[in-house]
């Protein structure tokens, strides 16, 4: 019997309308939940809202309503969005739910009694929007008065901060720092993608893990501390405990908690809240003597060509405007295909419409249309019985499908959706090529080979059946439509995916309808831009016609052969430290795929005052540069490539999924 599977989104903060960033996380978890169900697991999928906090209280006051009314309205809107996106969650938790608040209060008192929470005082720069405190050195920008005193600043998120000094209860994170590091060493795959764990250790634990303020007295919209009700529980104990309370932890009926928390537990979050989930949450579980989750997946963001989404820039994309125009499945497909694991992805209207036309309409839609039409034309709509090796091309098609199915399952288990879908589209492309190779219109002629024609039709139908199965977690409507046109029931499991498993004597529909009609590219791109509010860009972009220009370079022009002599490789930073006696140099230990690490010295120290942020990054290096001795004692075995802009140097990084030692060229 397969282990129960528990998957969670973060609980979203209902301070505004959710855009495609939040939709991405929720759909990504939904895809995994559906896949695991099809693979025979009992699944519990959790999502919900974080409904407490100062920002909610302030927004409710501005709207002239109570905080409860405000979050009730937001919850209604978010549930409607998840229904539109066909999200198959099992529970939608709200931190204002009575059962959750009761457990939060009880846990707070338990930790207070065991001295994992203590009373102190906190002073620091606080961002209401981020619900987070910052030190002066962490601020993106600092405001000073005429005497040079700091009077305010900007948080890394871009929100303003204010000075806050108040009594607060603290969670003893520092007490558990060594135990957390030991856990990370025992479970190096706990945080995905690779490299993110090193960031957390180097940036937050090694410099000294500070205790965390977990109560506030300057607002009232939260869970009161039972033994000291002028305090309300502040954000992270309240928010993080939802993953346990939703299953029944701390309640009379805890059967789901016993089942699913002892199964396989996956959390998926955006990279901006990784610290809270990778440090605060495991330590909280240690304090409560509860088992650790199996995996914490921190994904990147969808950004625009001109940076992060912003209403003022006219570049915000809401899921509703895409679903209402193009349907649900194109959105789910686009989001899951377009965001590389561990990296950010760029949304453009051109790419969105292009993927619908080229990948969904052309590749998949045309394959289905041609197959159904030919089976009707040549065999009166009945799919011929499947036989192996009816043509010279059958074995190759079958072998490719088997190999791509193995890749698909491997990537699905790794939550690498772009590569899983790439495997599916490799099957689609190979099946389209199979039509051209076998030329059924020739086999159908009077002097043709009817047995081979029958084998071709059977292989086409069987291949489409496989495709309909493996896209089901991503595109439920499309999967059902393909199965219906093939005369089959909707997909219910992924256990029988061999070509030979196609049911005998199946009759396809008499006339198939296009599942993805081709779109007018220019009109639909203009529609998306108009919905985004970017009216200035509509129908005004002219095709770029390249002209021969005089090359501008600070150095002499070189030949391709000269450039080809330079070997640029991907290298992962394992360690980095300042070089004693030098203000400019950093000393790197990198894995460049040589079989053993190499040492490189780079003069970028002034541009990276916190050099540990580079640990885990994958950089570009010149790998075949002659080693040279530096500072009389170090041998530098390569060069780290950086982009120079003004006085600043920025190292060139690559997608974390690219293997170490990969050649760039």
Swiss-Prot record:
Which reaction(s) does the protein catalyse, per the Swiss-Prot or TrEMBL entry?
A: tRNA(Met) + L-methionine + ATP = L-methionyl-tRNA(Met) + AMP + diphosphate
Cellular component per GO?
cytoplasm
The UniProt entry, under CDD domains, shows:
Anticodon_Ia_Met (cd07957), MetRS_core (cd00814), tRNA_bind_EcMetRS_like (cd02800)
Taxonomic superkingdom: Bacteria
Query: GO molecular function: any one?
Result: methionine-tRNA ligase activity
- Cite the tRNA-binding domain residue spans from the record: 562-665
Q: Where is this motif: 'KMSKS' region?
A: 308-312
Q: Where is this motif: 'HIGH' region?
A: 12-22
BP term (GO), one: methionyl-tRNA aminoacylation
Keyword terms of this UniProt record: Aminoacyl-tRNA synthetase, ATP-binding, Cytoplasm, Ligase, Nucleotide-binding, Protein biosynthesis, RNA-binding, tRNA-binding
Q: Which family does it belong to?
A: Belongs to the class-I aminoacyl-tRNA synthetase family. MetG type 2B subfamily.
Function comment: Is required not only for elongation of protein synthesis but also for the initiation of all mRNA translation through initiator tRNA(fMet) aminoacylation.
Known NCBIfam families for this protein? Answer: metG, metG_C_term, PRK12267.1
Q: How does it assemble?
A: Homodimer.
Q: What is this protein called?
A: Methionine--tRNA ligase
Species name for this entry?
Answer: Streptococcus pyogenes serotype M6 (strain ATCC BAA-946 / MGAS10394)
Task: Read off the lineage from the record.
Answer: Bacteria, Bacillati, Bacillota, Bacilli, Lactobacillales
